[in-house]
Amino acid sequence: MMSSRMPWFYHPYVTRSDKIEHQYEFQFVHKFLSYVQGPSPIYKTIMPLLDKIDPFRTIRVKANLNPRTVKNETREMHTDWENCLTSIYYINTNNGYTSFESGCTVPSKANRLLTFNSNLRHASTTCTDEKVRVVVNINYYSKPTISIK
């Protein structure tokens, strides 16, 4: 994903809100899987990660690349999809992080997988110590569990 051959696409926003006008409010994205577009030509490259998560149904898989900024820029708090799970896989270590409305922060550490209820409001940040901050964001339904008492 850190290769110069990785197809990144410019997005003039980071969250769904188009109200924010800020010089750092953009990112580069690769949608591995989208409910609108289907799988990308390089979808198979993300399969080892999806196999580890083992989702019941995958809704969206996208990689986000945020260029370095002069200071850590915190993005808008948001939720992803309703009533499912979100996993964030951190590609590289940097001083960016994911923050939650509760005040909890999770540092960007390479090969870390963070999983949480998609209804939790969270925000990403940029980094200042590496050229880019790269994560993979996965929204999915987990396999149903049956409990018999």
Q: Model-derived features: where do they sit?
A:
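Short beta-strand His + acidic residue motifs that chelate non-heme Fe in jelly-roll/DSBH
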Residues: 76-78, 121-129
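A short coil-to-beta-strand element that immediately follows conserved catalytic motifs
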Residues: 54-64
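Conserved metal-binding segment of the jelly-roll/cupin
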Residues: 68, 106-123
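A short beta-strand-loop-beta hairpin characteristic of the jelly-roll/cupin
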Residues: 70-77, 82-84, 90-109
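Non-heme Fe(II)/2-oxoglutarate
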Residues: 1-56
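Short beta-strand segments enriched in hydrophobic/aromatic residues
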Residues: 65-67, 91, 140-142
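A short hydrophobic beta-strand segment most commonly corresponding to one strand
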Residues: 87-88, 130-146
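Residues that flank catalytic or metal-binding motifs in active/ligand-binding sites
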Residues: 57-59, 83-87, 94, 120, ...
